């Protein structure tokens, strides 16, 4: 049963000029509250999306750039496939991941389309 739900990104449609990633604002993970259930679920809502999105975590209470790491199994997209098609109807993808992460954030490289939202709960 989820306890908390957080919004990581919303209405992103600025396209990247290169292969570098942009980052959303950090949000608390299960480890922040010292919860015993480290299961998280991320839901990605995209529309005509071409790019890459992944979730990053950290075990540091006051993280620096080098403290963040990619959470395995959370990546969608590969910079070459349009996800969500060319329709006006957004498409949802979900990924489960476990860990007592203190902070969670979204990393993204948007080549085209829209990231409608990325939400996660634990």
Feature names for model-found ranges:
Residues 1-36:
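Transition segment at domain starts
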Residues 4, 9-11, 16, 65-68, ...:
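Intrinsically disordered, low-complexity peptide-like regions
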Residues 26-37, 69-122:
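Beta-sandwich interaction modules
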Residues 38-42:
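Structural beta-strand segments of beta-rich domains
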Residues 47-52, 111:
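Short proline/glycine-enriched turn/loop motifs at strand-loop junctions of beta-rich domains
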Residues 50-70, 117-121:
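Short, surface-exposed beta-strand/strand-loop-strand elements in extracellular ectodomains
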């Amino acid at each position: 049963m989820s306890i908390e739900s957080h919004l990581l990104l919303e209405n992103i449609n600025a396209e990247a000029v290169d292969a570098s990633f942009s980052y959303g604002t950090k949000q608390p993970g299960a480890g922040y509250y010292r919860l015993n259930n480290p299961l998280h679920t991320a839901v990605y809502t995209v529309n005509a999306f071409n790019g890459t999105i992944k979730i990053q975590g950290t075990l540091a209470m006051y993280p620096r750039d080098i403290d963040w790491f990619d959470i395995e199994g959370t990546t969608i997209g590969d910079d070459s496939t349009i996800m969500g098609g060319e329709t006006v109807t957004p498409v949802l993808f979900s990924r489960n991941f476990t860990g007592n992460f203190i902070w969670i954030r979204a990393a993204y490289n948007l080549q085209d389309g829209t990231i409608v939202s990325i939400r996660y709960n634990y």
